[in-house]
């Protein structure tokens, strides 16, 4: 699992590194070198391919400028595009000028014509305009910067698209919560220094980030254990999966029961059943209204079907008892309620009857409430205390707002 940090945590880590003997300059050089290495690999180590670096006035821009100088030493021909003129006493800027590599300044670029030209020539665009200190919620990108980022994003419409690499975080994204300016850079990859920032994993910002590449810049390793947030990657989940014994059979891997379905939404419960079977459950049982059984059984020969009694187009009052008996008979380990169930007075009573009867069924390892079951929950008084079995809920923002 990878540790992720907030802006304040990152600033604190950098401060700790400096206190322990690492200079701010050393941290910048490490970041700039890492950025240059990623840029070099992105263009396939072909110096003739254009590398455009967009340089802002802050620390993020400094990292980009150091990367430009390093690329020059390796034989590349970078083009630096400055958001505004830099201090003539800046050593990195002096070094770049002395290399006689090309550059332009946005404030001197009439109608951004020079930018348009180099954007179309570039195989790689490095976004080093703004870093993690930028908060677009409080201070949106200004008109001039927005014009630059819009044109960067428009290169995605080119026949031959350049690769867009952002340093630490794409310009226009809040590093803590993923809030995104309408004109934020849409990166193909983001190299993030020290630890990945929380906003890289939060939507809507996540859509603009691309591949996340954390790199070490020499922060103290003894502080890692105090960082509370971390990601869980799909590849890492395999370590949590129990090994399947060679003598296993369907009874080894437990029973999943899925409750839901209606005339309007017969497909939802079928998809859930198919997913449960593919995920490795030993046995899958679907409890759905009897009048849609034919729609579900076709194509699912490996699933057990428990028809729920109906009156007309609605579930019968005895449907909940049928579900509970099915749970008992198969000693269900995992119960999913909700896919395609529908939201009516009848289904509300149905879900309530099931939920309030689960605590005495010790064989249940967990209950998942999804879709229409989540819409029904707010109508059930003290639902969270009535359900003692371990619970997983899967609300989208609208459903979550009703639950709260």
In which residue ranges do the predicted regions lie?
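Internal gly/pro-rich beta-alpha loop/helix module
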Residues: 123-124, 129-228
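Short low-complexity, flexible loop/linker segments enriched in glycine and/or proline
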Residues: 94-96, 180, 299-303
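Short beta->alpha connector loops
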Residues: 85, 108-110, 171-173, 196-198, ...
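Structural alpha-helical scaffold elements that stabilize or flank donor/cofactor-binding regions
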Residues: 118, 183, 326-329
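Nucleotide and nucleotide-moiety/phosphate-recognizing core
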Residues: 37-131, 135-167, 350, 356-366, ...
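Small-residue (G/A/S/T)-rich helix-start motifs and N-terminal tracts that mark the onset
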Residues: 1-83, 189, 200-371, 375-404
């Amino acid at each position: 699992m990878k540790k992720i940090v907030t802006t304040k945590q990152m600033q604190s880590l950098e401060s700790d590194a400096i206190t322990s003997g690492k200079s701010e300059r050393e941290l910048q050089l490490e970041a700039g070198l890492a950025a240059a290495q990623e840029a070099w690999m992105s263009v396939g180590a072909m110096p003739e391919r254009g590398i455009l670096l967009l340089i802002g006035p802050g620390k993020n821009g400094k990292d980009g400028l150091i990367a430009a100088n390093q690329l020059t030493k390796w034989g590349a021909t970078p083009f630096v595009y400055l958001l505004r003129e830099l201090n003539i006493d800046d050593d990195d800027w002096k070094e770049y000028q002395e290399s006689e590599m090309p550059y332009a300044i946005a404030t001197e670029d009439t109608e951004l014509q020079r930018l348009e030209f180099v954007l179309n020539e570039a195989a790689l665009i490095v976004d080093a305009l703004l870093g993690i200190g930028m908060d677009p919620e409080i201070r949106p990108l200004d008109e001039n910067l927005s014009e630059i980022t819009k044109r960067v994003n428009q290169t995605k419409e080119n026949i031959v698209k350049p690769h867009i690499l952002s340093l630490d975080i794409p310009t226009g994204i809040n590093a803590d919560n993923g809030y995104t300016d309408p004109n934020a850079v849409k990166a193909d990859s983001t190299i993030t220094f020290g630890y990945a920032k929380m906003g890289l994993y939060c939507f809507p910002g996540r859509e603009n980030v691309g591949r996340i590449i954390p790199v070490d810049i020499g922060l103290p390793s003894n502080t890692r254990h105090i960082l509370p947030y971390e990601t869980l990657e799909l590849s890492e989940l395999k370590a949590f999966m129990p090994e399947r014994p060679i003598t296993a059979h369907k009874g080894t891997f437990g029973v999943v029961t899925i409750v839901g379905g209606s005339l309007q939404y017969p497909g939802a419960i079928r998809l859930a059943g198919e997913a449960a079977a593919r995920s490795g459950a030993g046995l899958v049982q679907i409890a759905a209204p009897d009048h849609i059984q034919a729609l579900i059984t076709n194509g699912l020969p490996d699933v057990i079907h428990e028809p729920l009694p109906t009156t007309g187009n609605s579930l019968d009052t005895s449907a909940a008892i049928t579900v509970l008996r099915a749970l008992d008979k198969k000693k269900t380990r995992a119960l999913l309620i909700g896919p395609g169930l529908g939201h009516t007075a009848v289904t509300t009573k149905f879900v309530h009857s099931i939920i309030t009867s689960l605590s005495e069924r010790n064989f249940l390892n967990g209950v998942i409430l999804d879709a229409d079951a989540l819409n029904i929950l707010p109508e059930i008084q003290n639902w969270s205390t009535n359900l003692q079995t371990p619970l997983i809920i899967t609300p989208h923002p609208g459903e979550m707002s009703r639950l709260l």
